[in-house]
Amino acid sequence: MYMKAIISALLVACCFLAQASDLSQKLKSSDYVLLMRHALAPGVGDPANYSLEDCKTQRNLNSEGKSQAVFVGEWLKKQGVKNAEVHSSVWCRCKDTAALLNFGEYKVEPALASFFDDMSKAKESNLKLQRFIAGKIKSKGDKALIMVTHHVNILEFMGENIASGDMVLAKVNPKGELISYKLIPRPE
């Protein structure tokens, strides 16, 4: 009976490690990128007259959102993602999420900016994102490429709504176009 429990525990641990290394191995390749919707920032859109230069005028992460971002970063590291190149939208809620993932410095990337205020820019924005991905997958080496962005950007890229803090493991072609994806719900 005791031996069965040990064997069961070892099997569970092996399955977990296989799953963990699968994510990190995929992210080391040039075929996969990880898109993340910023962590919880209650509300929809931004207040009237917001400014991208002034975080106080924007919708921002609350304390739960900050905790979510830290936890996601820790979870990714437990999955074997140790070395990552992180890019963020210019919005403060995305920059804060990127910083709290704790992979070192992140870079602001215009191709990740929200087009929520002008949905007519969806296709143009998605093409910019694809071009950005195409350029980065050629030069990232074995670093994971993590992009923190917005609901509308991810919806346009993959066609599915995701919640705050959720991630998408996206398989892409050399042009940065989506081939397939796996939704990774925000770990809790």
Where are these regions (language model features)?
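Sec-dependent N-terminal signal peptides
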Residues: A5-C15
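Active-site-proximal alpha-helix that buttresses catalytic centers in soluble enzyme cores
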Residues: S21-P110, F115-M119, E124, E160-E188
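Sec/Tat signal peptide C-region and signal peptidase I cleavage site
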Residues: F16-A20
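Generic beta-sheet signal
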Residues: D31-V33, K143-T149
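Short, well-ordered beta-to-alpha junction loops that form the rim of enzyme active sites
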Residues: S88-W91, V148-V152
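N-terminal secretory signal peptides that target proteins for export/translocation
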Residues: M1-M3
